[in-house]
Amino acid sequence: MRFILLALAFLGVAPMAEAQQRTRLTVYTALENEQLAPFKQAAEAALRDVEIAWVRDSTGVITARLIAEKANPRADMVWGLSVFSLLQMEAQDMLEPYTPRGAEALRPNMRSARSPMTWTGMDAFVSAICFNTVVAQQRNLPRPTTWQDLLDPRFRGQIVMPNPNSSGTGFLTMVGWIANKGEQGAWEFMNRLHENIQQYTHSGSAPCNNAARGEFGVGLSFDMRSVALKNQGAPIDIIVPTDGVGFDLEATAIMRGTRNLEAAKRLADFTVSRTAAELYGRYYALLALPGVEPTVRGYPAEFAQRLVSANFAEIALARDRLLAEWQRRYDGKSAPR
């Protein structure tokens, strides 16, 4: 009887001891909310002694917070943030140099060129137009095929777009226009587009959600959200403008100054693994790890075919200046925070 009681006591204590031995990693992210639970579950299943504590917000908010905390970092890692943001932090020596195990297999244009690496890519996300076909018929809105088509006066008050200062989607959309038209041409285009914009949101998903609900005819958003809503039956067409679309990389990095460096390195190893890439492939089709078949349904092939060429490092250095100029010109139509 005494042996049974001791055994039961041990079984009760063992899970508690295991929990106490786990290293808690504070991970900053701009992943979509529905990605947080599966990412955490997969990582913690692979790394039994690691616990992930997410800090999640839009790209602009997370980036500003990380930079503000530079002298006293609170994040151990970043998992799922714009490469533009990470390159900006790299220039400020905020990222811990580390080449995750297996990272050499990633596509060369989707990982750090430094040795050791300072960041590793996960996938690419791409700007898209969510076009509500029911609203379009009701309000006599023409189906756009190019960005230029959105300047039609019939779209006045019918377009919502993410604020680039808050949203990585807003920034990559603007970057696409700059790459396509040159900076001066892009500002001229945005001046005219601004006349048709009803509101700038603080989330990259919000414009497509708005369009899917029929609140507006057009939402400028990104591939994952547009495909997900279309698959759920929303009355939207996913339009990939023929004049080219901007894109960004979701990426991962260890923050310099983390007190949990060894655990962070192990999580970084996991983020470049095939298991992680298969997880990314549930949401995106343009993956950093070759040979992994994405499982996301209904992803238009035009996304990969119409990517504009962009110099990530150059744009990262200009990010603050571009965002300040955008703020000066257009912030009057931004949604309340």
List the model feature ranges, each with a label:
Residues 22, 30-37, 60, 74-215:
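Extracytoplasmic ligand-binding site segments that recognize negatively charged/polar headgroups
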Residues 105-109, 125, 189-194, 200-201, ...:
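Periplasmic-binding protein-like
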Residues 255-311:
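Mature extracytoplasmic/periplasmic domains
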Residues 130-135, 175-178, 249-260, 279-280:
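A bilobed periplasmic-binding-protein/Venus flytrap-type ligand-binding module shared by bacterial periplasmic
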Residues 84-88, 212, 216-235:
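A ligand-binding cleft/hinge motif common to bilobed small-molecule-binding domains
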Residues 2-14:
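Bacterial N-terminal signal peptides
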Residues 183-185, 288-337:
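An extracytoplasmic/periplasmic, membrane-proximal ligand-sensing/linker region
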Residues 19-77:
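Conserved N-terminal structural module of periplasmic/extracytoplasmic solute-binding proteins
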